[in-house]
C-alpha cells in the first residue's frame, strides 16, 4: 500500500493562504520558476491553476505540458511537490468562476485588483505527489464532530413541517451548531433572473425581499454557475461584496419600478473578510442559495464548504417538498425554479 500523500490529505495546502511555486521547461530543457497565486482542488485526480499572464510559464506549458508545483501547508510548514500534466484551459463555467471570485478576494487583500485578472483556469492531471523532506510542525488534530454536527442539522431540517420553520431552523442550526453568526437564504425567481432574500440571521435588518441578480457577486455567481463559491481573504470593500451594493444603488431609481426589492437594504456585512455561497439544488433544478459570511479571515475552510453543501442539498429538497405539499400553510412568494 502506497504511503504517498493524496490530494485530499494535502487540501490545506490548496486554500490559497500561501502562493505556490511552479517549475516548467521549454522544449530545449531550459527551466523556468514562477510564483502562482492559485492551486485549486478540482477532484481527487485534478487541480486547477490560475492563468493570469501570457508569460514564460504559459509559453512553456503550451509547448511542454509537464510541470511541478511546490505547495506549503500553512499550519505544519511542510512542503509537497505535485507532478502535473496540463490538459486544458477553461475560461467559463463553475471552476473558472469560483477561481475568479477567489482571486478577486486575494486581489483586494493585496491591493492589486487591476493586476490580478483571471484569464483562464488551467486544468492539470495530478500524476503523483511527493512529500519533500524537511522539518515541520506537528499536524493539528483533525476537526472532530463534523459528521455529528451535520447529523444534528439534518435532524432539525427533517422535523420541520412549514417553510418558515424550515428556513429559520436551518439558520438557527448554522448559528448554534456551526458558530456561523451571519447567514441568509435567497430564493430564485427564474423569470426575473433574480435571487431574493427570504430569511437571514445576525444582521441589524433582515433584508427580506432584497434582491441580487444572477451572476452578481459571490451569491449570484454561485447561483448562475451552480457551484459553491468561497472567498477567504476580503478586506475594505472587496470587489465581490460592495459591487452588490453599488449595483443596487445604481438600479434603485424611480425609473425602475419593476425591479422589485431593490429599495430594500441588502443585509450583508459592510466589510466581510470571508464568504461562502452554496447553491440550493433539488432534482437538478436551482431553487436558491445558502450564504454565510464572517468578519474574520479564513473563517470557512473546505470542510465547512463540504458540510454546507451537504446541508444545502437536504434544505433544497425539503423546500421543494413543502412547496409542493397541499398542506403548506406558509408558502414563499411565487418562486420559479430554473430547469436543469
Give residue ranges: language-model regions:
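Regulatory sensory and allosteric helical modules in signal-transduction proteins
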Residues: 205-268
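Regulatory loop-to-helix N-cap segments in sensory/regulatory domains
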Residues: 270, 287, 293-311, 318-327
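Short hydrophobic/glycine-rich mini-motifs in sensory/regulatory modules
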Residues: 280-290
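Short, structured beta-strand-loop surface elements
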Residues: 56-102
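Amphipathic alpha-helical coiled-coil segments that mediate homodimerization
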Residues: 149, 153, 162-181, 185, ...
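Amphipathic coiled-coil signal-relay and dimerization helices
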Residues: 32-35, 193-201, 210, 231-232, ...
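A short, aliphatic-rich beta-strand micro-motif
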Residues: 255, 263-265, 273-281
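Signal-transmission linkers at sensory-effector interfaces
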Residues: 134-163, 321-338
Amino acid at each position: 500500500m502506497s504511503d504517498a500523500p493524496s490530494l485530499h490529505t494535502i487540501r490545506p495546502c490548496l486554500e490559497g493562504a500561501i502562493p505556490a511555486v511552479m517549475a516548467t521547461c521549454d522544449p530545449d530543457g531550459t527551466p523556468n520558476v514562477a510564483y502562482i497565486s492559485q492551486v485549486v482542488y478540482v477532484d481527487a485526480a485534478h487541480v486547477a491553476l490560475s492563468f493570469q499572464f501570457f508569460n514564460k510559464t504559459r509559453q512553456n506549458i503550451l509547448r511542454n505540458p509537464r510541470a511541478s508545483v511546490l505547495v506549503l501547508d500553512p499550519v505544519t510548514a511542510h512542503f509537497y511537490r505535485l507532478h502535473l500534466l496540463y490538459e486544458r484551459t477553461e475560461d467559463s463555467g463553475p471552476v473558472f468562476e469560483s477561481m475568479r471570485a477567489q482571486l478577486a478576494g486575494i486581489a483586494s487583500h493585496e491591493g492589486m485588483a487591476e493586476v490580478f485578472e483571471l484569464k483562464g483556469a488551467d486544468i492539470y492531471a495530478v500524476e503523483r505527489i511527493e512529500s519533500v523532506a524537511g522539518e515541520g510542525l506537528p499536524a493539528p488534530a483533525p476537526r472532530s464532530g463534523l459528521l455529528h454536527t451535520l447529523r444534528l442539522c439534518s435532524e432539525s431540517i427533517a422535523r420541520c413541517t412549514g417553510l418558515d420553520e424550515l428556513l429559520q431552523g436551518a439558520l438557527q442550526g448554522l448559528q448554534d451548531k456551526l458558530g456561523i453568526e451571519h447567514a441568509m437564504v435567497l430564493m430564485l425567481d427564474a423569470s426575473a433572473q433574480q435571487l431574493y432574500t427570504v430569511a437571514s440571521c445576525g444582521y441589524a435588518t433582515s433584508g427580506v425581499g432584497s434582491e441580487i441578480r444572477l451572476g452578481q457577486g459571490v451569491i449570484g455567481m454561485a447561483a448562475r454557475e451552480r457551484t459553491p463559491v468561497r472567498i477567504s481573504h476580503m478586506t475594505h470593500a472587496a470587489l465581490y461584496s460592495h459591487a452588490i451594493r453599488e449595483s443596487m444603488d445604481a438600479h434603485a431609481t424611480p425609473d425602475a419600478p419593476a425591479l422589485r426589492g431593490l429599495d430594500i437594504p441588502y443585509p450583508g456585512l459592510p466589510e466581510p473578510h470571508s464568504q461562502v455561497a452554496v447553491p440550493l439544488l433539488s432534482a437538478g433544478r436551482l431553487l436558491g442559495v445558502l450564504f454565510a459570511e464572517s468578519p474574520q479571515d479564513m473563517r470557512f475552510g473546505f470542510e465547512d464548504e463540504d458540510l454546507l453543501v451537504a446541508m444545502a442539498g437536504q434544505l433544497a429538497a425539503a423546500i421543494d417538498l413543502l412547496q409542493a405539499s397541499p398542506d403548506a400553510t406558509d408558502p414563499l412568494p411565487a418562486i420559479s425554479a430554473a430547469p436543469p
